[in-house]
Amino acid sequence: MRQYLQLLEDILENGVEKDDRTGVGTLSVFGRQLRFNLQEGFPLLTTKKLHIRSIIYELLWFLKGDTNVRYLQENGVTIWDEWADENGDLGPIYGAQWRSWKGADGKTVDQISWVIEEIKRNPNSRRLLVSAWNVAELDKMKLPPCHYAFQFYVADGKLSCMWQQRSVDTFLGLPFNIASYALLTHMIAQQCDLDVGELIFSGGDVHLYKNHLEQAKLQLTREPRPLPKLVIKRKPASIFEYEFEDFEIVDYDPHPHIKAPVAV
């Protein structure tokens, strides 16, 4: 995943200093894209160790339509704790929008179910898109969506995915996002009897927090290792029936973890 390291270099060399909501401050660039061929391996960062358990459980949590951290905590995942209220609630964030988008007429739309059925029915559609940016509900969310939309594309029997991200915590968040959307693409491809194609990231405000700069420089001293492979052990009847134990990451040999504080 040398392209990720090149993005770190880009921000360190070309980023402008900006104040931000968290008060930490960032080095920021605008409008960047990364591409990953999913045929070449599962894009799990190797220049530092990632917590695979958190990535998988978070995606399963989104797909459940859940917006309370209880499920995550019960499974040893704490990545959303800082934003939850005293009851563990986060408001109508990703899971709510993916599974039960509220329209102006009061009806809800299960976008995940819809997009899978549409891929099967009309794979050439240019409307294979899911959005989490529900303007009418943004003020109810503890954290408005950073990765706010994703689109699928089918060609030559392969499913590709591109996701849009308005705000990109490049050191901590982006490696998780890459792996999460890669996993989602594999799952939906399996459900639609397709192979996987390309994964594309498109970011708006792409930044490094100022308290992540030394960690990014350390990471740049490390040589990327071969990508691992994802094994999905079974094909459930629906996208919503996958369990943590269905996934295995094979031959993951990363460099050691690099600790960095989360900007809340």
UniProtKB/Swiss-Prot annotation:
- Keywords of this entry: Cytoplasm, Methyltransferase, Nucleotide biosynthesis, Transferase
Q: Give the pathway annotation.
A: Pyrimidine metabolism; dTTP biosynthesis
Q: What is its EC number?
A: 2.1.1.45
Xref: InterPro entries: Thymidate_synth/dCMP_Mease, Thymidate_synth/dCMP_Mease_dom, Thymidate_synth/dCMP_Mease_sf, Thymidylate_synthase, Thymidylate_synthase_AS
User: Which cell locations does it reside in?
Assistant: Cytoplasm
**Residue stretches spanning the membrane:** none
* One GO CC term, this protein: cytosol
> According to its UniProt record, which residues of this chain constitute the active site?
146 (nucleophile)
A Pfam family in this protein?
Thymidylat_synt
Q: Which GO terms describe its biological process?
A: dTMP biosynthetic process; dTTP biosynthetic process; methylation
Task: List residues binding (6R)-5,10-methylene-5,6,7,8-tetrahydrofolate.
Answer: 51, 169, 263
Q: Which PROSITE patterns match?
A: THYMIDYLATE_SYNTHASE
Record field: catalytic activity: dUMP + (6R)-5,10-methylene-5,6,7,8-tetrahydrofolate = 7,8-dihydrofolate + dTMP
- Binding residue positions for dUMP: 21, 126-127, 166-169, 177, 207-209
Q: Which CDD domains match?
A: TS_Pyrimidine_HMase (cd00351)
Q: List the molecular function annotations (GO) for this entry.
A: thymidylate synthase activity
Q: Which family does it belong to?
A: Belongs to the thymidylate synthase family. Bacterial-type ThyA subfamily.
List the NCBIfam families hit by this protein, alphabetically: PRK01827.1-3, PRK01827.1-5, thym_sym
Assembly state and interactors?
A: Homodimer.
Q: Which PANTHER family match?
A: THYMIDYLATE SYNTHASE (PTHR11548:SF9), THYMIDYLATE SYNTHASE 1 (PTHR11548)
- Function of this protein? Catalyzes the reductive methylation of 2'-deoxyuridine-5'-monophosphate (dUMP) to 2'-deoxythymidine-5'-monophosphate (dTMP) while utilizing 5,10-methylenetetrahydrofolate (mTHF) as the methyl donor and reductant in the reaction, yielding dihydrofolate (DHF) as a by-product. This enzymatic reaction provides an intracellular de novo source of dTMP, an essential precursor for DNA biosynthesis.
Which protein, by its recorded name, is this?
Answer: Thymidylate synthase
Q: Species name for this entry? A: Geobacillus sp. (strain WCH70)
Q: What is the lineage of its organism?
A: Bacteria, Bacillati, Bacillota, Bacilli, Bacillales
Gene it is expressed from = thyA
